[in-house]
Regions:
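S-adenosyl-L-methionine/SAH cofactor-binding core of RNA-modifying enzymes
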Residues: 35-103
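N-terminal beta1-alpha1 ligand-phosphate binding loop
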Residues: 1-31
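Acidic beta-strand-to-loop metal/phosphate-binding motif
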Residues: 7-9, 75-77, 106
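Short glycine-rich, acidic/polar surface loops and turns
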Residues: 91, 103-116
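Short, acidic/small-residue loops that bind anionic groups at enzyme active sites
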Residues: 97-106, 126-134
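Short glycine-rich anion-binding loops that position phosphate/pyrophosphate groups of nucleotides
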Residues: 11, 78-81, 109-112
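Structured adenosyl-cofactor binding patch, chiefly the S-adenosyl-L-methionine
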Residues: 111, 115-159
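A structural signal for isolated positions on well-ordered beta-strands in alpha/beta enzyme cores
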Residues: 2-6, 40, 104
């Protein structure tokens, strides 16, 4: 199984990008012993369409076109489900045990996700009730993926 963060827009070099890369690298290393074959970042261009609905539809099309057969799609959405780190880890572990080949975590553009992506989602996930900048949402998600790996492996990073 592999994890892919599919994000609309590109993250510039700097402290935020360094922190994102650090958590992705930690997740890669921690996941190897758990059968995770990769933790990838897929940055897609923002739509240039004039209308928000057209931008969302175009961006959703890009995310959906990249899904392989059997993949699970997790969309980050402000109206999504709030989960504890332990529950998030259990969900990932269940999908791994079900031989899901890939989990794609989608972070939409400034206008959010298009209806097609929301309808296809296997899980709509919120990172709490607050709205986060997309760069911080990427970092939070990468950290939670790493944390899930440490929970599954019994590493002391996650303390209750």
């Amino acid at each position: 199984m592999r994890f892919t963060l599919s994000c609309i827009g590109r993250m510039k070099a700097g402290a935020d990008r360094d922190l994102l890369d650090r958590y992705l690298d930690r997740a890669r290393k921690s996941g190897r012993g758990l059968g995770i074959t990769g933790v990838l970042l897929n940055e897609m261009p923002e739509s240039r369409a004039q209308r928000a609905e057209d931008r969302k539809a175009e961006e959703a099309g890009g995310i959906l076109a990249s899904l392989q057969s059997g993949a699970r799609l997790v969309v980050l959405d402000e109206n999504g489900r709030n989960m504890s780190s332990a529950a998030f880890s259990r969900t990932l572990e269940t999908w791994k045990n079900d031989s899901v080949p890939e989990i794609v975590f989608a972070i939409g553009g400034a206008d959010g996700h298009g209806g097609e992506a929301l309808a296809r989602a296997d899980l709509k996930l919120a990172l709490g009730a607050m709205t986060w900048p997309h760069q911080i949402a990427r970092i939070l998600l990468a950290e939670q993926i790493y944390r899930a790996m440490t929970i599954q492996s019994g590493h002391p990073y996650h303390r209750v």
